[in-house]
Amino acid sequence: MAEAVWSTDTGEAVYRSRDPVRNLRLRVHLQRITSSNFLHYQPAAQMGKDLIDLATFRPPQAASGHRPDEEEEEEVVIGWQEKLFSQFEVDLYQNESACQSPLDHQYRQEILKLENSGGRKNRRIFTYTDSDRYTDLEEYCQKITTSASEVPSFLAERMANVRRRRQDRRGVEGSKLKSRIVTWEPSEDFIKNNHAINTPLQTMYIMADLGPYGKLGYKVHEHVLCILKVDSNGVITVKPDFTGIKGPYRIETEGEKQEHTSAWKYTIDNVSSLAQPEEEEREQRVFKDLYGRHKEYLSSLVGTDFEMIAPGALRLFVNGEVVSAQGYEYDNLYVHFFVELPAANWSSPPFQQLSGVTQACATKSLGMDKVAYFSFPFTFEAFFLHEDESAESLPEWPVLYCKVLSLDFWQRYRVEGYGAVVLPATPGSHTLTVSTWRPMELGLVAELRRFFIGGSLELEDPSYVRIPGTFKGERLSRFGFRTETTGTVTFRLHCLQQSRAFMESNSLQKQMRSVLDRLEGFSQQSSTHNVLEAFRRARRRMQEARESLPQDLVSPTGTLT
């Protein structure tokens, strides 16, 4: 006798769907393999051979639509997270003392309603949903290999803990969380145990009670038919895959006696209802309208016209960040910073804020230094207009000044250091480290005052870090001014430059010149343009005066009398 065609591929299949998972419907057909249905299955597997058709030996259907022995075959349509109770759960939850959790009491009420309405629609096929304890325990005890003597590794245990829902730890509405959401000082073990990504999953098990007739309701006879997993991204994992055109899956059970040993076959089919053409068209129209409105919203934010600047001008746009400060004496640091624009040729838009103060930040030990991470963003823009055409004038660039202070328990501040750095003249991303210093007094009294009271010397003009704006001489002397080197401040700057000079690409020489040289060329072009415009106006006036004269005076052919 030929062997029947069974599906041996029990691996999982992955699907992706944008539709709500609640519309998923599966049809599970379970049947015991007996001599009659086994022979009936042979012709389908041996198509094209001269075999006797045994379909006539198939047992007739009963008037009720079921086979005479309802324990031999069952077919159920199951929805996503639909709960079908097993005989074991029915017997368990009928005893009120066995109900311990609110979910157990809910299951008890549902079972009592089913008993009053005529009983369950299923006999052997049942389900475990994402809320059941079986889902947590099965995922925690799941093996990675097929070895019977497998010992789970540390990584396997950690990943099992990541995937568990921890049903017993779900908080009740209105209760206070016992665990901290943010761990401010994580230990090395905490970092090692919590580095894995936890993707939210919902799991559902389709089970079958394959016990002998009249002995249903024992855990030992429960077998997994299918495992369904759905994550928040719409990825559906089915193990094993839908039967489709493949043969049915086979399960063999063993019992203490020969009559308790049996074989079963089952199929899993996707019977989810397809969307109607009208619904698909309506959905496409809704998505098209949604995307169109989102596109219009983005267009309204960007605008239709590209913002241009005047010829000979340069627009500097800076997205900056105060990254960190390290190497200072006291804790709880904050930074006061501002941008100074040169008085000549530079300007900023109205209501432009060129200064800022970071938040107070506690330091963290990093090697021998204490580092305070601010990650404080700031943004500003400025305009440069080249108007001075004298050869002796050199363009100046904006300067970023910073002042580092510390705050104690009584809200008293101390100056920890001053620093300054010239903004980069080239566009792109730049990371700048600014070294700072602070003025100091000699003697122990000054240090005691700084420690207990918090007072310290400060600069009246912060621009004294470089060249003060009020200085008009040729040489600046700081002789006798005592300072002490302190820590460093790290800035991250993303500089953007916009100018019409960048459009000049006629020759390699122009491409290699700096933007300031191009801006100077724009000023020369502007003066030449003014001369040409004045010549055109003079020529136009001459033509108007010529047209107003009599023709006999203008005509060169006239004769003298």
Curated annotation (Swiss-Prot):
Tissue: Widely expressed in embryo at 15.5 dpc, with a relatively strong expression in brain, liver, kidney and digits of the upper limbs. Highly expressed in bronchiolar epithelium.
Lineage: Eukaryota, Metazoa, Chordata, Craniata, Vertebrata
Protein name: Tectonic-like complex member MKS1
Cell compartment(s), UniProt: Cytoplasm, Cytoskeleton, Cilium basal body; Cytoplasm, Cytoskeleton, Microtubule organizing center, Centrosome
Subunit organization: Part of the tectonic-like complex (also named B9 complex). Interacts with TMEM107. Interacts with TCTN3, AHI1, TCTN1, TCTN2, CC2D2A. Interacts with FLNA. Interacts with TMEM67. Interacts with B9D1 and B9D2.
Record flagged with keyword Cytoplasm: yes
Cytoplasm is among the record's keywords: yes
Function in brief: Component of the tectonic-like complex, a complex localized at the transition zone of primary cilia and acting as a barrier that prevents diffusion of transmembrane proteins between the cilia and plasma membranes. Involved in centrosome migration to the apical cell surface during early ciliogenesis. Required for ciliary structure and function, including a role in regulating length and appropriate number through modulating centrosome duplication. Required for cell branching morphology.
Keywords assigned: Cell projection, Cilium, Cilium biogenesis/degradation, Cytoplasm, Cytoskeleton
Pfam families, alphabetized: B9-C2
The encoding gene: Mks1
Organism this protein belongs to: Mus musculus (Mouse)
Cystine bridges: none
